[in-house]
Curated annotation (Swiss-Prot):
Topology in membrane: Multi-pass membrane protein
Organism ancestry: Bacteria, Pseudomonadati, Pseudomonadota, Gammaproteobacteria, Enterobacterales
Protein name: Inner membrane-spanning protein YciB
Compartmental location: Cell inner membrane
Family: Belongs to the YciB family.
Gene: yciB
InterPro entries on file: YciB
UniProt keywords, alphabetically: Cell inner membrane, Cell membrane, Membrane, Transmembrane, Transmembrane helix
Gene Ontology cellular component list: plasma membrane
Secretion signal, residue range per the UniProt entry: none
Domain of life: Bacteria
Task of the protein: Plays a role in cell envelope biogenesis, maintenance of cell envelope integrity and membrane homeostasis.
Length: 179
């Protein structure tokens, strides 16, 4: 159910874009993201940091898009989110000396420190590449291509990278954890 809720604003954004335009889609995205946040609080009595950060960025960049009637703001949101994710991953590893991925998954998985570091850097690089790809597609290609890339391309890339990360983790698990 939670995974469905995470993707609901994206589905709403896409549907409103196809039915109306980028501004209706942006309005719908803001509302849908707020509803998901409220639902999460009511249902689970918890709001994840990433969900809250995403909502704030959706509200700010979406609000600027609507206020100035300029779709460039909502296009930048994707890159800003990915830059923040990459920055958090890199800072956790280089400044805090413990990769964020390890902080998130370390209780469930026993992996060598080197593997955690490589996985953390791989995700940071993934977010940087996706952010740069978003800039190129958002500002050099037609809007409808950017919307499709945002909805389907980035979702597919994230799913594929998650699966590849799972394979990488599995290869480095101690034998007793693989069963």
């Amino acid at each position: 159910m939670k995974q469905f809720l995470d993707f609901l604003p994206l589905v709403v954004f896409f549907a409103f874009y196809k039915l109306y335009d980028i501004y209706a889609a942006t309005s719908a995205l803001i509302v849908a993201t707020a509803i998901v946040l409220i639902y999460s609080w009511v249902r689970y009595r918890k709001i994840e940091k990433m969900a809250l950060i995403t909502f704030v960025l959706v509200a700010v960049f979406g609000g600027l898009t609507l206020f100035f009637h300029n779709d460039e703001f909502i296009k930048w949101k994707v890159t800003v989110i990915y830059a923040l994710f990459a920055g958090a991953l890199l800072m956790s590893q280089w400044v805090m000396k413990k990769p964020l991925i390890q902080r998130m998954l370390g209780k469930e998985l026993a992996l060598p420190q080197q593997i955690w570091s490589k996985l953390n850097l791989a995700w940071a690089l993934f977010f940087i590449v996706c952010g740069l790809a978003n800039i190129y597609i958002a500002f050099w290609l037609p809007q409808n291509i950017w919307v499709n890339f945002k909805v389907f391309g980035l979702t597919a890339l994230t799913l594929i990278f998650t699966l590849l990360s799972g394979v990488y983790i599995y290869r480095h698990l101690p034998q007793e954890d693989k069963s």
